[in-house]
Amino acid sequence: MLILACLPIGDSRDASAHLIQSIQQVQYVAAEDSRKFARLCQDLNIKHNAKVISFFEGNESEKIEELTNLLKSQKDVLVATDAGAPGISDPGYRLIRAALQSNVEIKVLPGPSAVTTALLLSGLPTDRFCFEGFPPRTQGARAKWFEELAQQERTVIFFEAPHRITECLVDAGAAFGLDRSGAICREMSKHYEEVVRGSIAELITWAKSKEILGEITVVLAGFDPASRQIADEDLIKMVFELEEIGESRKEAIAQVAKKYAVAKRVVFDAMVTYKSEDKI
């Protein structure tokens, strides 16, 4: 059986009795960091006889065959990431797929999640939301990533490293608008937990004001269609006017998006819709 264990995201007291019992009884543990797993067991006074196998992003591909063979031989393997749920911006998904393809039974031990914890702490709408993992590390790719999310009407949740949070928020502000509401949740459930709520502009000011350490989850409000100040027809008209004076379609869309402080995707989609209606 493959056991996917949700571990505490900060406070070891959040570990369930079911998790503790499973660690005590399982034969193998695939741990993202064996030292952190050992520390958790020490904090919870868990004594176990499981063989701990290193299983992290760098060796995930090569370890899948070994772990799958154990599962196929009727051994129980518990997957333990550093915190939270396996497969959620952590190793696990490929092993889950391999286990299913081998007809191995899968069991999940529910528990803490940085995604839902941050969502609740943010004070933003919880009825519809999406989790986007980590933004790209390079500025160009990250800016495009945010542009594609700018018109997302669901609350958007993602992780970010502390040393990139300022530049990340700047790119988010450029795509979403600096007045979009959001929250930064840092070191959740730990002693130095901090939650900062406000507009993206205010979050940028906060990020620039101090040295930021620890694990960060960012929550941003979804796009409100009613907040758009300009109709699609006006965006399209401006694109045509720029094309008439020699600008390319791509450059015209970029200029219109900048002028009206909307994502390029909004202008592009308006043009596509216009074309699909045979007006171009």
Mark where each language-model region is.
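Alpha-helix capping/helix-boundary segments
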Residues: 35-37, 84-85, 114, 164
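Class I SAM-dependent methyltransferase SAM-binding "motif I" and its flanking Rossmann-like core
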Residues: 94-152
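General beta-strand structural signal in soluble alpha/beta enzymes
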Residues: 31, 108-111, 158, 184
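Glycine-rich, flexible N-terminal cofactor/catalytic loop recognition
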Residues: 1-57
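Conserved helicase motor
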Residues: 54-61, 135-136
